[in-house]
UniProtKB/Swiss-Prot annotation:
ATP binds at G607, P608, N609, M610, A611, G612, K613, S614. This is DNA mismatch repair protein MutS. InterPro entries: DNA_mismatch_repair_MutS, DNA_mismatch_repair_MutS-lik_N, DNA_mismatch_repair_MutS/MSH, DNA_mismatch_repair_MutS_C, DNA_mismatch_repair_MutS_clamp, DNA_mismatch_repair_MutS_core, DNA_mismatch_repair_MutS_N, DNA_mismatch_repair_MutS_sf. The gene is mutS. The keyword DNA repair applies. GO terms for molecular function: ATP binding; ATP-dependent DNA damage sensor activity; damaged DNA binding; mismatched DNA binding. The lineage of its organism: Bacteria, Bacillati, Bacillota, Bacillota incertae sedis, Caldicellulosiruptorales. This protein is involved in the repair of mismatches in DNA. It is possible that it carries out the mismatch recognition step. This protein has a weak ATPase activity. CDD domains: ABC_MutS1 (cd03284). Transmembrane segments: none annotated. Coiled coil: none annotated.
Length: 863
């Protein structure tokens, strides 16, 4: 049996190293896939499946994609959950002895995929290291150079919440931690990799070599080190370009759990699952991708540091009050490319001349941007002015060296500007003159042969050639040497053309090689300044985010909140930032809010469905979040005492995937709130208890409300919307509980939602009115009204009967000693009463008869 061909032997050897990947094997201008990889790729990419002789008298299934368009195919495979290994030719095929040397240069996974189209959003990869009961989390976006790490102590739910903020596309965990693997799989759709963790000493070695990070403990180092080890192993590059490392403590930021983030629609809407109609969609008016990502980060992690919040607010206020300067700054920002992502391309050596020109255009506006920043006085803007590096040396290098019309490819020539390098100029002159000679030669041959459409062309296989169409074959002279036959033409060469070709090719080849060499030198010089470039990118992102906040404040009539360390939340004429944009400013009804930790701790809000209870409660939470981000808020006036956590229990939904019912999901969320809320927290409860029977639900809602209102237990600021009108009694029983309702106006059988929150409880849910608004047939509504009337009468009867029964028993007890001889008879009468099926009048008559007998008995006793 024949052995595999040498090339296929090489392929099989390399494939053994990446069994879990689809191997893109470079063959000339294509990436080829073989065997099972080819079968999978042809199906997933919808490309033709062919075959290639591989030895052993067999043909291997094969498919391929052009190397210059491979990125889009790789993206499709990554999106479908595959890993892709890139195997490149690492020596010149012309110089190779035997099979061209090839090596795996990169393994691409969901978390290490870099979008060449530069999507605005981050693409994080996360590593979770569990040490005892604690969780060390590290997040990296290799495309922007950002790295964040934190330690979650003994709280798996908090770990889940923190990971959700970054929405990582890939999560790494130890291959030994089966329990953690199940938790991750249950909560995220991310690509989960179980890897063999390296020891802590190796982690520290890697960190020292790659990052120069200090002041992290062993638990965090285990997470950081294993993530770095994975990246180095798959990307085959150094990660010392990652300069933006931040270790943070979760408790140093406003904590918002996953459920609340979803309920408040912070980053995406619940229905469309998109940025549109979310708070992020309103706040993100950034002109750069860097600013957009920073706004999202600020939204995921609002501050609790009053000083830093007010630094942002003061900067936004100054921009707000200087609209002409704001407009000029935003105009400059619009011309800035994604410098963070351009920076990462230096590490991968994938940056091209077009990228450098984009960097140059971005740097070009920096001197003017710095000049405008010098006009401001607020501390944060002055700090940004001082830190903004205009990178004039980098600009000068690119401007003097890179041709404005440079191609994307690095080995096509035309990259280096005239006048930058003498040798380039000399070779370019030869090349240009030779081309002129070719034009002259073409004209000469047309005249000699009489073939008017004769033309000279070039391809990599045959070099320069003379092409003659079929109709002119009879005019071809004998000195023409045939090289290639086409369907409608023949291609020829002459000795004179060969001589010209040698001159041109040698000059052009040397020129291409020299230009590439010079480009690499320029690239490396700029890469040596990468830390300065990244710091400038960070400054630009902050400036952009602050300008976005100022602009939306102007457009949407927001006001600067007073943020302080107290416990009071006072909002005058507050609005929901998203809803008011959807329905129009003039159509939105604003509302006041007053919450504190004393007499306004818990606001019970009643009113019909669709009246606006949920919108009102959400808007309070969103205003708090916006204020603690350092953003102006949709209100006439706002005083926000710092909140440490925001919780919400809104809506009812089954968690089918985990087998949890509506009520179980609801109670789990309530339990999480009761366990983690503090007096500094803000809690939103919407219809607690409606997922079970009326009495169970009422009992639970009542107990929950008592618990959160109790200062000795939680005492948190709480908004509690309910249809259980019985809960309004708590205003009289618990200090700090206040009743509010959404006001409505009745007009006959119809109601008008006034959307106004007013003092006092609501004694009707207006369910039938809402059903009428929803279009329920009138026949059904009339029947519903009949049933409601009977139920209400029955309820009155039950209450009255209960009251009468108590009165009868009291009367009986008082008189029993006077008619002991009649007591059995009277007790029997009472026991035989069908209380629920008698009217109040009948009950009063019976009571009168019993009373009459007792009086008679007393009289007999006294005789």
């Amino acid at each position: 049996m024949q052995e595999l061909t040498p090339m296929m032997q090489q392929y099989m050897e390399i494939k053994q190293r990446v069994k879990d990947c689809i191997l893109f094997f470079r063959l000339g201008d294509f990436y080829e896939m073989f065997f099972d990889d080819a079968i999978i790729a042809s199906k997933e990419l919808e490309i033709a499946l062919t075959a290639r002789d591989c030895g052993n008298n067999e043909k291997a299934p094969m498919c391929g994609v052009p190397y210059h368009s491979a990125h889009s195919y790789i993206a499709k495979l990554i999106e479908k959950g595959y890993k892709v290994a890139i195997c490149e030719q690492v020596e010149d095929p012309k110089l190779a002895k035997g099979v061209v040397k090839r090596e795996i240069t990169r393994i691409i996974t969901p978390g290490t995929f870099i979008d060449e189209n530069f999507s605005k959003a981050n693409n994080f990869i996360c590593c979770v290291a569990r040490v005892e009961s604690d969780f060390a989390l590290t997040f990296v976006d290799i495309s922007t150079g950002e790295m964040y790490a934190c330690l979650i102590e003994n709280d798996i739910q908090k770990m889940i919440n923190e990971i959700s903020k970054y929405a990582p596309s890939e999560i790494l965990i130890s291959h030994l931690d089966n329990e953690l693997y199940e938790v991750i799989r249950e909560n995220y759709n991310s690509f989960v990799q179980r890897i063999e963790f390296i020891e802590i000493d190796r982690c520290y070695d890697l960190i020292d070599k790659q990052m120069q990070i200090t002041n992290i403990n062993d638990k965090v180092a285990l997470s950081v080190g294993n993530l770095l080890n994975y990246l180095v192993d798959t990307q085959k590059i150094s990660f010392n370009y990652i300069k933006k490392f931040e270790f943070y403590r979760v408790q140093n930021y406003l904590q918002i759990d996953l459920s609340t983030k979803r309920n408040l629609e912070l980053t995406e809407s619940i229905i469309a699952r998109s940025k549109k109609n979310s708070l992020f969609g309103i706040l993100d008016q950034a002109k750069t991708s860097m600013g957009s990502r920073l706004i999202k980060k600020w939204l995921e992690r609002p501050l609790i540091d009053v000083v830093e919040i007010n630094r942002r607010l003061d900067a936004v206020e100054e921009l707000y009050n200087n609209f002409p300067l704001l407009m000029q700054i935003e105009g400059l920002l619009e011309g800035i490319y994604d410098i963070e992502r351009l920076s990462s391309k230096f590490a991968y050596k994938s940056i091209n001349a077009k990228d450098l020109l984009s960097l140059k255009k971005s740097i070009e506006v920096l001197p003017r941007l710095k000049e405008l920043l010098g006009e401001f006085k607020s501390p944060l803007l002055k700090e940004l002015y001082n830190e903004l590096d205009t990178l004039e040396d980098v600009y000068s290098l690119i401007d003097s060296s890179i041709n404005e019309d440079a191609p994307v490819g690095l080995k096509e020539g035309g990259i280096i500007k005239d006048g930058f390098n003498d040798h380039v100029d000399r070779l370019r002159n030869i090349s240009k003159n030779s081309k002129e000679l070719l034009i002259q030669y073409e004209e000469k041959e047309r005249n000699l042969t009489g073939i008017k459409n004769l033309k000279i062309g070039y391809n990599k296989v045959f070099g320069y050639y003379i092409e003659v169409t079929k109709s002119n074959y009879s005019l071809v002279p004998e000195r023409y040497i045939r090289k290639q036959t086409l369907a409608n033409a023949e291609r020829y060469v002459t000795e004179e053309l060969k001589k010209l070709e040698d001159e041109i090719i040698n000059a052009e080849q040397k020129l291409v090689e020299l230009e590439y060499e010079l480009f690499c030198q320029i690239r490396d010089k700029i890469e040596s300044q990468i830390e300065r470039i990244q710091k400038t990118a960070s400054c630009i992102a902050i400036i952009d985010a602050l300008c976005s906040f100022a602009h939306i404040a102007i457009d949407n009539r927001y006001t600067k909140p007073i943020v302080y360390l107290g416990d009071r939340i006072y909002i005058k004429n507050g609005r929901h930032p998203v809803v008011e944009k959807m329905i129009g400013y003039s159509n939105f009804v604003p509302n006041d809010t007053e919450l504190d930790n004393d007499q306004n701790r818990v606001l019970i809000i009643t009113g019909p469905n669709m009246a606006g209870k949920s919108t009102y409660m959400r808007q309070v939470a969103l205003i708090v979040i916006m204020a603690q981000m350092g953003c102006f808020v949709p209100a006439e006036e706002a005083q926000i005492g710092i909140v440490d956590k925001i919780f919400s229990r809104i809506g009812a939904s089954d968690d089918i995937s985990s087998g949890q019912s509506t009520f179980m999901v609801e109670m789990s969320e309530v339990a999480n709130i009761l366990k983690n809320a503090t007096p500094k927290s803000l809690i939103i409860f919407d219809e607690v208890g409606r997922g079970t029977s009326t009495y169970d639900g009422l009992s639970i809602a009542w107990a929950v409300l008592e618990f959160v209102a109790d200062k000795s237990k939680i005492g948190a600021k709480t908004l509690f919307a309910t249809h259980y009108h019985e809960l309004t009694e708590l205003e009289e029983k618990i200090s700090g509980v206040k009743n509010y309702r959404v006001d409505v106006k009745e007009e006959g059988k119809n109601i008008i939602f006034l959307r106004k929150i007013v003092r006092g409880g609501c004694d009707s849910s207006y369910g039938i009115h809402v059903a009428r608004l929803a279009g329920i047939p009138e026949e059904v509504l009339q029947r519903a009204e009949q049933i409601l009337k009977k139920l209400e009468e029955a309820d009155i009867n039950r209450k009255e009967a209960k009251r009468l029964r108590k009165e009868i028993k009291r009367e009986f007890t008082e008189q029993i000693e006077f008619f002991s001889y009649k007591k059995d008879e009277i007790i029997e009468k009472i026991e035989n009463l069908d209380i629920l099926n008698i009217t109040p009048i009948q009950a009063l008559n019976i009571l009168s008869e019993l009373k009459h007998e007792i009086i008679k008995a007393k009289e007999r006793q006294l005789l």
